[in-house]
Amino acid sequence: MGRTQKKNSKGRLDRYYYLAKEKGYRARSSFKIIQINEKFGHFLEKSKVVIDLCAAPGSWCQVASNLCPVNSLIIGVDIVPMQPMPNVITFQSDITTEDCRSKLRGYMKTWKADTVLHDGAPNVGLNWVQDAFTQSHLTLQALKLAVENLVVGGTFVTKIFRSKDYNKLMWVFQQLFDKVEATKPPASRNVSAEIFVVCKGFKAPKKLDPRLLDPKEVFEELPDGPQNMQAKVYNPEKKTRKRDGYEEGDYLLYHTVPIMDFVKVEDPIQMLGTTNKFTLDKDDHEWKIVKKLKQTTPEFKACIEDLKVLGKKDFKMLLRWRKAARELLGLDKDEEQPEIETVPLTEEEQIEKELQEMQQKQNLKKKREKRKQNEIKQKEITRMQMQMITPTDLGIEAASIGRDSLFNLKTAEKTGILDDLARGKKRMVFTRDELAEDNEIQIDENAPLSDRDDLADADELESQLDAMYHQFKARRIERDAHFKAKEARGGDDDAWNGFDEVASDEEPEESKKDYVDDDDSDVSDSDSDEAINQLIAKIKGETGDKKLSAKARALFNDSIFDGVEADLPSEEPQAPASSEQGSKKRRLEEVSEESSSDEEEAEEESDSDFEIVRNEKDESDDDYDSEDEAERSQKEKHAREVDIATVEAMTLAHQLALGQRSKHDIVDEGFNRYSFRDRDNLPEWFLEDEKMHSKINKPITKEAAMAIKEKLKALNARPIKKVAEAKARKKMRALNRLEKLKKKAGLINDDSDKSEKDKAEEIAKLMKKVTKKAKLKPKVTLVVAKGKNRGLSGRPKGIKGKYKMVDGVMKNEQRALKRIAKKHRKKSKH
């Protein structure tokens, strides 16, 4: 008896068929769920309860039993019977019936499923439209079972046929799951219309709309919307063909309409889109009247003969003619609107109306202020989260709030908040009562509401412009690397702060500060500036004991340390007056203390009968040497800090070095027409634009440009950090090996049992190990495939190591490649 040949239509006996036979799976579809599981995060390995709907013959249940954790509950159900499987519960039932639901509840008890699988399909082959709808209906029933049994965050995998109901099902899935994705695994045949949808993150809504799982509601056919005839009339060139067939009862493609119907119709555009020709009835009385219009030209009569060839201009001409015809026939008469009598308001009603308007304006103002306060609070919260606790950041942020909310240092000093500001406290916006205590700050409550609204609108417009400018800068930073580097450096500061002078012995630093802060000085012209100076000095740690560092002075300037020094005993021993070991630093401190208390000395001199004369001590040669060393070190430090990086700076340095310019010339150049421009209360975008153009073009020299070029050449010639570090590591390893060699050689020399010859040989071996060269990569031997080597298979005779067979064709190809590369290089240069 001969063997029957198994059918192989659509390539059914493919490699997955044979793989399933080898692995022991019941069907090739098992590889579909394996590939889906690997692609979407191995959800089966995390599932303790799995339900497989339409499970026959059971291949997906086999995969689940292999991949799920031990002692997992796996249930398979199908309308046809299945062979039993180990670790899997199977029963026969229809998933669309109540019997299936009750059996599932009986097996699961109080558990919920982590994953629900569905690979079912109807018996196909009659009508594709009907088969696709039946599959979509079956998928919706499977989703209904999954919604009843899935745990929160569960996974649902189902099969769908590509059809017109696909998008409707996807919309339903997206309402119930967080993430919905369609996929087609490689195990699925390309000729098959099936695709698989993986829904992850079940939302488990408390109340579910029953229409969401009702097939009648989900797959309802919606009527088509009205045709866009306006697009046909105003864009006749763009034609989109839709093969929808004929309208019911109308089987003609050519339509003619009398011209007077076009005049009387309410929707002329609809008629123009569906009509091919307008006919003229010469016996019509109304046409005889309309024919006398000046718009009724021969061109008009030619256009109405074939409407399908007209353009936008021609259609507009027809609509203008229709409007003129309707006016002539009296069809566009405006409906007379009944006159509304206006009753004048009484005095009480007028007052009440004005009060309502004022109340509305007041409510708008309160709403605006509340919104501003919420924005300020939100900014403060963001600032605290970003740890922006420095007073500079707070002041910059508060400057955009407005005059009423802007803090004042003088008010802060009076209310006792200045110390909190120095410590970095966040509260900088004062209340209305605190501002009222200060006589300099007045809040105009009687200002008209309209003026205040205009000011608020102006502020809002300015803030919008600033925001737009910041967005522009952010986009430019992303696009332009040079601008990003410039912003990171902070840009060029045009403000000139004068020359930094080094404090001399005769005029210590503290005495200079006292001189600057004197009442006769012009720096502190107001109480506000004085408070600012005090706050800055307190923050920087300039006040306090000079023996401490700047950070320590800033710490001990805090108000919590006030009065602590009075309680602590003095631990500093007083040095005798005759001691000769006092350093120059000690003498500087004594001189600074004397110079900082000039007023007290003057009072003491007036009260005392003795005249106090300062003791002038001769400084030794060592002091002069130390002064020279200090001055030299300070110059070296200044040279390290100042880097001449531009051609202008190099030109200026050359001129100063050669005596062509002096310090006074540079100071005079600092006073120009751009120096004293008013920059207060100007927006940032305006200042940035002005900074680009409001600057003096300083001259440069050829020598300075060459010097900068040579400097950059030297910088570029230096190796990069990685190369330098690699060389240093290599050198360090060599030194370490040499040190080890020295130790070993010393041990060999100390060994008395060995002869001098043996010692020399061992030391030579050690030296050979240290100085051995790295292994060179073996070269590939090129063998020309001609003569006895032509058509040779295997290794040629007399060739050892790696080899490569070459011929004349390969040589020509290499030449051609070099020629093409050279041509491309020439093109790229142009």
Swiss-Prot record:
Active site per database record: 159
Compositional bias ranges of the Basic and acidic residues kind: 631-642
One of the GO BP terms on file: maturation of 5.8S rRNA from tricistronic rRNA transcript (SSU-rRNA, 5.8S rRNA, LSU-rRNA)
SUPFAM superfamilies in alphabetical order: S-adenosyl-L-methionine-dependent methyltransferases
Entry keywords, A to Z: Coiled coil, Methyltransferase, Nucleus, Ribosome biogenesis, rRNA processing, S-adenosyl-L-methionine, Transferase
Root EC class: transferase
UniProt feature, compositional bias: Acidic residues: 516-529, 591-610, 618-630
Subcellular location: Nucleus, Nucleolus
Subcellular location, principal: nucleus
Similarity comment: family membership: Belongs to the class I-like SAM-binding methyltransferase superfamily. RNA methyltransferase RlmE family. SPB1 subfamily.
Subunit organization: Component of the nucleolar and nucleoplasmic pre-60S ribosomal particle.
Protein name as catalogued: AdoMet-dependent rRNA methyltransferase SPB1
Organism: Eremothecium gossypii (strain ATCC 10895 / CBS 109.51 / FGSC 9923 / NRRL Y-1056)
Source taxonomy: Eukaryota, Fungi, Dikarya, Ascomycota, Saccharomycotina
Gene: SPB1
